């Protein structure tokens, strides 16, 4: 097994153990650690959100004061304290839904 494959397996296992939907959740956690792009109370839109790992992380970081919206063309299971919309992000109609959610 290549080293890169072993590392992916490590994060896949860790994601499963910690309840994240994908190992990509750790990418957002690392980016946020370095650049602080999301904080408590942040409003976040995740375009192309399937399977939802980044939505999970964004919701945990933004907390109850923030709002997180995930949009994807495919079905994504609900995530507590976040909203998921199954919609085409290239459709003009999605803009109204985003504005409506964030008010």
What kind of region is each of these model predictions?
Residues 29-33, 55, 71, 95-96:
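A generic local structural motif
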Residues 65-69:
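Short beta-strand element of Class I
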Residues 40-50:
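Conserved class I S-adenosyl-L-methionine
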Residues 51-64:
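Conserved SAM-binding loop of SAM-dependent methyltransferases across substrates and taxa
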Residues 28, 48, 84:
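Residue-level signature of catalytic and energy-coupling elements of molecular machines
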Residues 1-40:
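Class I SAM-dependent methyltransferase Rossmann-like catalytic core
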Residues 71-103:
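S-adenosyl-L-methionine
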